[in-house]
């Protein structure tokens, strides 16, 4: 691993947010632990925070200057944690709240792509459950 200068962080406390309550919890824990290991190797003051519920998230974020978001899926990529961190004035990695909310909404994201003439496959928005020969992907989650 190449040495990186982390002196700009000074004595800042970094929370590595991992786990979460989505179906992607296990991969998030692996990602978070890999990030934590790297930060510690760089002698950065980092601590793992395993978030298990939306309610608990609000309590566990005190006393940190920066959050490294290693959460996946709902709660981590949908704007929830970003909004919470923004409200608490904690700096964080990744996109801002509104970008996350938009990106997790597949239909709205495709509409934006089309607005900017970006190539994207045709799609149909289904608002009621019914039978279809199309593959249905979750609205606010991964693409199992």
Model features per residue range: what roles?
Residues 34-45, 61:
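A short, N-terminal amphipathic alpha-helix
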Residues 47-61:
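Eukaryote-biased intrinsically disordered, low-complexity acidic regions enriched in Ser/Thr/Pro
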């Amino acid at each position: 691993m190449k040495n990186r200068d982390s002196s700009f962080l000074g004595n800042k406390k970094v929370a590595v947010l991992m786990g979460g309550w989505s179906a992607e919890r296990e991969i998030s824990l692996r990602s978070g632990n890999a990030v934590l290991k790297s930060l510690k190797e760089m002698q950065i003051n980092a601590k793992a925070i395993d978030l298990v519920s939306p309610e608990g998230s609000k309590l566990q974020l005190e006393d940190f200057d920066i959050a490294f978001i290693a959460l996946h899926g709902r709660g981590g990529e949908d704007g929830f944690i970003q909004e919470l961190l923004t409200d608490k004035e904690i700096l964080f990695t990744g996109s801002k709240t509104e970008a996350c909310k938009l990106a997790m909404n597949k239909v709205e994201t495709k509409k934006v792509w089309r607005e900017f003439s970006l190539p994207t496959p045709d799609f149909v928005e289904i608002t009621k459950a019914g039978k279809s020969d199309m593959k249905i992907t979750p609205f606010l989650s991964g693409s199992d």
